[in-house]
Swiss-Prot record:
Gene3D superfamilies (alphabetical): Erythroid Transcription Factor GATA-1, subunit A, Retinoid X Receptor
DNA-binding region as annotated in the record: 84-159
Name of the gene encoding the protein in the UniProt record: NR2F1
Region feature (Disordered): 1-82
Name listed for the protein in its UniProt record: COUP transcription factor 1
Recorded family membership: Belongs to the nuclear hormone receptor family. NR2 subfamily.
Source organism: Bos taurus (Bovine)
SMART domains, sorted: HOLI, ZnF_C4
């Protein structure tokens, strides 16, 4: 009777998924044959040596299933039953499960470095570069994007390894597949919307909400510029939007920037008492007829009313993020390549808001409806009035739509030639 002795296994072998002693023909044959007596007799007959049990650490000791097999890989050339698993990012040989997915050492290290250092990359092409063994180092932006899309977890880098059975809301939100309904998906989607905010709300609120803090015209114009920048930065980092064609991104933001600006102004409690002062200064620089002055001041009043009505609802940060996503993903924009897809993204955002409101405000059954009813009114605020009120001193006659296009194409909201604002 053949006697099978389990070989000693170094813990490092489980981590690396390999055998430090290197592949051994006898060990490979024993592993591939499952330790059957018939194959062992054939080995002995072929070698002319009797079978002798080997001790731990002896070269050529038969490996037990679970060393390389636990990582989904085995030594090259073996006829093993273990399946070779590729890196889900680049297709290279996986070294195990890292941050929720099977990846190679290179992609594991790249993802960990990118998350820990909070690195930001820029794609020089169309944000759809091929990521494989030969091209993975050519575009860091697309490589990180693919890491997130296949489900690698940022939280696992920051907090240590997470159990594989734990759901990953970010993976659901970043997958352009069939719509996933359910609280887990929706709450994960909202968390990604919130994470995309470039600045904490308190950064504005701490300055704007202090009653004794008097802000000058220049400060208000700078704050307005920051609100516009934050809208573009937020959109560029939320789920689904970066995957759209750049022409669609430009079309959506050019149509909705003023609505996003009003939402941001309400969210940061922008001091609206200075609006008449801004108007007076603007009218002094560019005189208008009496009729135009009346119309202009009426539009300022509408802007103030919309902001105050939003503030009266005490909208929280998650609700603001959902409202902005509903506004942004509108199929009303001209020239969209796939209007139906944009509309489906708007429905996703609306469902997320409804689920959130029902779970967080169960005693306010009409809250969801009140929030949605505020959105059509945002379009009553004239974008040209916002432009003339807050931005004419900074950018002159350059249209805001042109600035938005340049921001998206340049990959940075703060490196543009029209003005210089320090956003430290």
């Amino acid at each position: 009777m053949a006697m099978v002795v389990s070989s000693w296994r170094d813990p490092q072998d489980d981590v690396a998924g390999g055998n430090p002693g290197g592949p051994n023909p006898a060990a490979q044959a024993a592993r591939g044959g499952g330790g059957g007596a018939g194959e062992q007799q054939q080995q002995q007959a072929g070698s002319g040596a009797p079978h002798t049990p080997q001790t731990p650490g002896q070269p050529g000791a038969p490996a037990t299933p679970g060393t390389a097999g636990d990582k989904g890989q085995g030594p090259p050339g073996s006829g093993q039953s273990q399946q070779h698993i590729e890196c889900v990012v680049c297709g290279d040989k996986s070294s195990g499960k890292h941050y929720g997915q099977f990846t190679c050492e290179g992609c594991k290290s790249f993802f960990k470095r990118s998350v820990r250092r909070n690195l930001t990359y820029t794609c020089r092409a169309n944000r759809n570069c091929p990521i494989d063994q030969h091209h993975r180092n050519q575009c860091q932006y697309c490589r990180l994007k693919k890491c997130l899309k296949v489900g690698m977890r940022r939280e696992a880098v920051q907090r240590g390894r997470m159990p594989p059975t734990q759901p990953n809301p970010g993976q659901y939100a970043l997958t352009n597949g069939d719509p996933l309904n359910g609280h887990c998906y929706l709450s994960g989607y909202i968390s990604l919307l919130l994470r995309a905010e470039p600045y904490p709300t308190s950064r504005y609120g701490s300055q704007c909400m202090q009653p004794n803090n008097i802000m000058g015209i220049e400060n208000i114009c700078e704050l307005a510029a920051r609100l516009l920048f934050s809208a573009v930065e937020w959109a560029r980092n939320i789920p689904f939007f970066p995957d759209l064609q750049i022409t669609d991104q430009v079309s959506l933001l050019r149509l909705t920037w003023s609505e996003l600006f009003v939402l941001n102004a309400a969210q940061c409690s922008m001091p609206l008492h200075v609006a008449p002062l801004l108007a007076a200064a603007g009218l002094h620089a560019s005189p208008m007829s009496a009729d135009r002055v009346v119309a202009f001041m009426d539009h300022i009043r509408i802007f103030q009313e919309q902001v105050e009505k939003l503030k009266a609802l005490h909208v929280d940060s998650a609700e603001y993020s959902c409202l902005k996503a509903i506004v942004l993903f509108t199929s009303d924009a001209c020239g969209l390549s796939d209007a139906a897809h944009i509309e489906s993204l708007q429905e996703k955002s609306q469902c997320a808001l409804e689920e959130y409101v029902r779970s967080q405000y169960p005693n306010q059954p009409s809250r969801f409806g009140k929030l949605l009813l505020r959105l059509p009114s945002l379009r009553t605020v004239s974008s040209s009035v916002i432009e003339q009120l807050f931005f004419v001193r900074l950018v002159g006659k350059t249209p805001i739509e042109t600035l938005i296009r340049d921001m998206l194409l340049s990959g940075s909201s703060f490196n543009w030639p029209y003005m210089s604002i320090q956003c430290s």
